[in-house]
A protein has these predicted regions:
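Bacterial Sec-dependent N-terminal signal peptides
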Residues: 1-25
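Short amphipathic alpha-helical segments and helix-helix/interface helices
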Residues: 189-191, 327, 364, 421-422
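Intrinsically disordered, low-complexity acidic regions
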Residues: 244-246, 281, 324, 345-346, ...
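Short, flexible loop/turn elements at secondary-structure junctions
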Residues: 113, 123, 151, 268, ...
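Short loop/turn motifs at secondary-structure junctions
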Residues: 333-334, 398
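N-terminal accessory beta-strand-rich subdomains and adjacent acidic, glycine-rich linkers
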Residues: 25-282
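An acidic-aromatic substrate-binding cleft motif
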Residues: 255-329, 333
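Aromatic- and carboxylate-enriched substrate-binding clefts and catalytic-loop regions
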Residues: 341-433
Length: 433
């Protein structure tokens, strides 16, 4: 009887807690008070984004579907934590800014089911992510990233006809109410503009061991996310890439104890604020290397981009003299690099043998003499097939870095390839173009 009574009390307490939480609204503001996120816990996790009294995103939903259930459906809130972070981060490699101010208010919702949802609200944007705390690996089948617009927005989108894309299409602008469900999807970033002129940039950050996100129209003045599935069987297609023969049912198989990529919205009154934003840097994990002094950003001459040379006293083409000419050009104009595209190789699949008319050691020596660094082009498939030896050998040759090409994918495998390349290149102090 005592055990039954305790059990009944436990159920009543759980029902009381669930009843108190269902429909609960949690608000978090930016440090300057101009941006607000309103989160509502009902059958799903809903959120809306405001600037002042204006609603920018209306009752959007978020969730993550795993092979054994969905996070964010019928959420049970266990604990809420709010706080403020105000720090300055010195960039390892200064680009727009040497020091970045990272100032935001956060809200962390610890949920039943071993996961947490974290929101960060900045003066110039909003971000959220999922964090899981499971002991065994998990399979992510998909995400519920579903955003709704309160009125007709202007959208500028990089169109992708398939998940295999070079991310090089010209952005197309349209009205969101005209963006139909059967229209092609878009890759990130995507830019929206409200009738009042407010800009909203959609993108992601801290992407590791996970595929890139794409967007598609809901058909009802909104967008939702799609992701490429993880390839499990493939074969060579040509010297540049392979053909995927079979995909998994999931988009990622990954650690069960991790944080997932940030989904963020930069909010800007004008293009100036949009260009100045450092959201990706602020949301990304700290850099792992202690010494970046060898990384030298710079400009490059590149024969593929401008291959026509006239009025010279030598035969123009894939030969030593032509590349020396490009090095002279770079040195004269203060360009830090010369990029040798695919013509430097005897064959695209052979990273060791230069074109017979190119004396590569002489080109590298000549470039060094003129204070210009050499970058070599390679296809990603050639890099992958020679991964263990390639970086060390190129560093030994005196090459400054690599331009790796034709990935044209952003599934989990390929995202991990990007990270493997960056780590191995850094180990040998090679830059990646």
């Amino acid at each position: 009887m005592k055990k039954i009574l305790i059990g009944v009390i436990g159920v009543l307490i759980q029902l009381a807690v669930s009843g108190a939480v269902y429909g609960k609204v949690l608000n978090v503001y930016s440090p300057d008070g101009t941006v607000k996120v309103s989160i509502e816990l009902k059958d799903k996790i809903y959120y809306s984004v405001f600037t002042g009294d204006d609603i920018l995103l209306d009752r959007c939903t978020m969730g993550m579907t795993l092979s054994d259930g969905t996070l964010g459906v019928k959420p049970v809130l266990r604990k809420v934590r709010k706080g403020t972070v105000n720090e300055s981060r010195k960039r390892e490699i200064p680009l727009k800014n040497e020091t970045v101010r990272n100032h935001y208010n956060y809200l962390r919702m610890n949920m039943a089911g071993d996961y947490t949802v974290e929101f960060r609200v900045f003066d110039d944007g909003v971000a959220y992510r999922f964090i899981t705390d499971r002991k065994t690996p998990i399979e992510v089948v998909g995400e519920d990233f579903n955003i709704n617009f309160p009125t007709d927005y202007r959208a500028c989108l990089g169109e992708a006809h398939a998940f295999s894309t070079s991310y090089e299409s010209v952005y197309t602008c349209m009205q969101t109410e005209s963006y139909r469900k059967d229209d092609i999807m878009a890759y990130l970033p995507a830019l929206l503009e409200t009738p009042g002129g407010c800009k909203i940039l959609i993108s992601e950050a801290d992407l590791t061991d996970y595929p890139c996100m794409f967007l598609k129209s809901t058909g009802n003045n909104g967008m939702y996310a799609l992701f490429p599935k993880c390839p499990v069987r493939f074969e060579d297609d040509n010297d540049y890439k392979f053909k995927i023969l079979e995909e998994a049912s999931y988009i990622a198989r990954t650690s069960g104890k991790r944080s997932f990529p940030w989904r963020f919205f930069v909010i800007a009154k004008n293009e100036k604020v949009l260009v100045e934003n450092e959201m990706v840097y602020k949301l990304s994990a700290p850099c792992e290397l202690a010494d970046y002094s060898w990384v030298k950003p710079g400009k490059s001459s590149w024969e593929w981009w401008n291959p026509r040379i006239y009025d010279v006293d030598f035969r123009v083409g894939a030969n030593t003299q032509t590349y020396k000419y490009y090095i002279d050009f770079a040195a004269e104009l203060g360009l830090e690099y010369t990029l040798m595209d695919g013509a430097w190789m005897a064959a695209a699949s052979d990273p060791w043998t230069p074109h017979p008319e190119i004396d590569l050691p002489e080109v590298i020596r000549y470039a060094k003499e003129h204070n210009v660094k050499i970058l070599l082009w390679l296809s990603w498939l050639t890099v992958e097939k020679h991964f263990d030896q390639l970086f060390a050998k190129y560093a030994e040759w005196g090459v400054a870095g690599l331009k790796i090409d034709f990935m044209e994918r952003s599934d989990q495998w390929m995202v991990n390839f990007y990270e493997r390349v960056a780590k191995e290149a850094a180990k040998h102090k090679l830059v990646i173009d």
